[in-house]
Amino acid sequence: MAALLRRLLQRGRPLAASGRRVGRREARLGTGPGVAVRVRFAPSPTGFLHLGGLRTALYNYIFAKKYQGSFILRLEDTDQTRFVPGAAENIENMLEWAGIPPDESPRRGGPAGPYQQSQRLELYAQATEALLKTGAAYPCFCSPQRLELLKKEALRNHQMPRYDNRCRNMSQEQVAQKLAKDPKPAIRFRLEQAAPAFEDLVYGWNRHDVASVEGDPVIMKSDGFPTYHLACVVDDHHMGISHVLRGSEWLISTAKHLLLYQALGWHPPHFAHLPLLLNRDGSKLSKRQGDIFLEHFAAEGFLPDSLLDIITNCGSGFAENQMGRTLPELITQFNLTRVTCHSALLDLEKLPEFNRLHLQRLVNNESQRCQLVEKLQALVEEAFGSQLQNRDVLNPIYMERILLLRQGHICRLQDLVSPVYSYLWTRPSVGRAQLDAISEEVDVIAKRVLGLLERSGMSLTQDMLSGELKKLSEGLEGTKHSNVMKLLRVALSGQQALSSMFKVQG
């Protein structure tokens, strides 16, 4: 970069010229015939994927699929100081787990790669060179100490911190002298023009006079890495992004991005800024909340469809909110023009109910049920292992029957290996004192039950069993039918309360 600056000085190019302005384009949905819809999800690998990121990725995915477009994953990893090992792999893994895999990504590749910004530095250098040549950018030699003093002084005066543009109007001689001492200056973008108004597809018409409230922003750091503002503009242009769907926190930055597009002579994409996903109490989702990461939900047995369902149910973009929507239904029903400016409040206490609906749907699908049986077998092995007195409980037919009987009653597959359902897999340990506390006629009742089973055998139906059980307490002083049923429940399951005694016995 220093060599380029010296060449510009030698050629006598003006460092104070302004960038070229392109015509304002009417903002519209832009999904008509012949339009190649290309959207991107561009997280920073500074942490693992969480629900807020999943929602942004999902809206991009369903928008792309609704219009037969492409969904791109781009990792914005230019801030090397905040890089978290394993985060890049986790983001792509979790998108695939959620059922919304990218069409192009660091792992999958594609025609617009590479898909990690740290591997695209040459493109940013070329854009910076173009901006320096037209005078739309200039070198900044201010030290971190000076910038920190500016910030503290502004805060002391109750003002918004901003750069004072000190290096903007340096002469060629001054720049040459500075370069001799500091060959790696930062590069700032000159905010001289009024930012154009633009029509956001969610928030409507916007105009932000960024130059009146901010100093000239850094677009290239002294280490040769770009800042977000330059990198996202360069990447969206070279990757052919048609629509930028991102969080509303970036709405105010769009003015800078449009000025960069103008200075580089490029047409901007359509912008749609999505309202934030907040906690139920209105607070922001935070990476400090350990339970908002997708890995947590996957480990806890929540289904991807239930997460996609709840994060769209609490927001907007659909004609109505309803529970139980699948991904194909989300794609069909999604309408970007229905996304409102209101933040979405996420109530995770409702997630078990969403998961119950989606789990029940899978149980009722034969092929999906077979996959659930395999997962349940692994869960039972892991939970009970050597405690299994009879490995016949791992028989797929038995497990399939359990799933069909308990569908609608369980919220997660893991519920079936909780202590409440342990009787399905192991014999309960019940002491004689526990049985005697229910009835003094334990032995008599046991003999009557055995006799009933020997007489009826496999021909015993639920209706027959119900009638026969009512006879078990006949002639037993101090023992009611309720005592008999409680005794059987404890003997069979180790619990005094079960949803259906007859299904357990069956």
UniProtKB/Swiss-Prot annotation:
InterPro entries: aa-tRNA-synth_I_CS, aa_tRNA-synth_I_cd-bd_sf, Glu-tRNA-ligase_bac/mito, Glu/Gln-tRNA-synth, Glu/Gln-tRNA-synth_Ib_cat-dom, GluQ/Sye, GluRS_core, Rossmann-like_a/b/a_fold. The keyword Transit peptide applies. Disulfide bonds: none annotated. A motif ('KMSKS' region) lies at residues 284-288. Keywords: Acetylation, Aminoacyl-tRNA synthetase, ATP-binding, Ligase, Mitochondrion, Nucleotide-binding, Protein biosynthesis, RNA-binding, Transit peptide. The modification N6-succinyllysine is found at residue 256. GO terms for biological process: glutamyl-tRNA aminoacylation. It holds the Pfam family tRNA-synt_1c. ATP binds at residues 50, 249, 284-288. It catalyses: tRNA(Glx) + L-glutamate + ATP = L-glutamyl-tRNA(Glx) + AMP + diphosphate; tRNA(Glu) + L-glutamate + ATP = L-glutamyl-tRNA(Glu) + AMP + diphosphate; tRNA(Gln) + L-glutamate + ATP = L-glutamyl-tRNA(Gln) + AMP + diphosphate. GO terms for cellular component: mitochondrial matrix. Its EC number is 6.1.1.24, 6.1.1.17. The keyword ATP-binding applies. The modification N6-acetyllysine is found at residue 486. SUPFAM superfamilies: An anticodon-binding domain of class I aminoacyl-tRNA synthetases, Nucleotidylyl transferase. It is found in: Mitochondrion matrix. Residues 1-41 form a transit peptide. GO terms for molecular function: ATP binding; glutamate-tRNA ligase activity; glutamate-tRNA(Gln) ligase activity; tRNA binding; zinc ion binding. L-glutamate binds at residues 40-42, 76, 228-232, 246. A motif ('HIGH' region) lies at residues 45-53. Non-discriminating glutamyl-tRNA synthetase that catalyzes aminoacylation of both mitochondrial tRNA(Glu) and tRNA(Gln) and participates in RNA aminoacylation for mitochondrial protein translation. Attachs glutamate to tRNA(Glu) or tRNA(Gln) in a two-step reaction: glutamate is first activated by ATP to form Glu-AMP and then transferred to the acceptor end of tRNA(Glu) or tRNA(Gln). In vitro, cytoplasmic tRNA(Gln) is slightly glutamylated, but with low activity. PANTHER family: GLUTAMATE--TRNA LIGASE, GLUTAMATE--TRNA LIGASE, MITOCHONDRIAL-RELATED. Belongs to the class-I aminoacyl-tRNA synthetase family. Glutamate--tRNA ligase type 1 subfamily. HAMAP family: Glu_tRNA_synth_type1 (MF_00022). This is Nondiscriminating glutamyl-tRNA synthetase EARS2, mitochondrial. The gene is EARS2.
